[in-house]
């Protein structure tokens, strides 16, 4: 515990906020080749690699992921939700924030049903989260 005199000499520093989705906090001006401070809820990018990885210890699966080169020159790893996907290299995707707890380093989700990503086929419940259209009667 510091004394009052110590606090007068060197006050307490406010805690700095560290973003959970750093790639969404910057834009990119391609004309001047500089970062801009424009934050965004989603970002567009191009898939550079699509594959599967295994989750952390208590879980077991092959989780689908894509390495995405964003429009602000960041390269991030994003999770592909839902059963089955049509993504391949050079697919244009839209990403949002949201980590996957059992995949280390995956802080983003790909939005299904946007740009080149198809929605989940045959999905009846929670369709809006997976870009699935309403089935015809």
From Swiss-Prot:
SUPFAM superfamilies: Nucleic acid-binding proteins. InterPro entries: NA-bd_OB-fold, Ribosomal_uS12, Ribosomal_uS12_bac. CDD domains: Ribosomal_S12. The modification 3-methylthioaspartic acid is found at residue 102. Residues 31-41 have a biased composition (Polar residues). Pfam families: Ribosom_S12_S23 (PF00164). The keyword Phosphoprotein does not apply. Belongs to the universal ribosomal protein uS12 family. Part of the 30S ribosomal subunit. Contacts proteins S8 and S17. May interact with IF1 in the 30S initiation complex. This is Small ribosomal subunit protein uS12. It comes from Oenococcus oeni (strain ATCC BAA-331 / PSU-1).
């Amino acid at each position: 515990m510091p004394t009052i005199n110590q606090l007068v000499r060197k006050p307490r520093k406010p805690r700095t906020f560290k973003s959970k989705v750093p790639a969404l906090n910057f834009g990119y001006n391609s004309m001047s080749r500089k970062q801009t401070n424009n934050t965004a809820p989603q970002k567009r990018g191009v898939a550079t690699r699509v594959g599967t990885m295994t989750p952390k210890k208590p879980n077991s699966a092959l989780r689908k992921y894509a390495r995405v080169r964003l429009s602000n020159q960041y390269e991030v790893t994003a999770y592909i939700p839902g059963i089955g996907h049509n993504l391949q290299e050079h697919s244009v995707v839209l990403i949002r924030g949201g980590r996957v707890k059992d995949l280390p380093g995956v802080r983003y989700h790909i939005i299904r049903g946007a740009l080149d990503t198809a929605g989940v086929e045959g999905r009846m419940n929670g369709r809006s989260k997976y870009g699935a259209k309403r089935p015809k009667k």
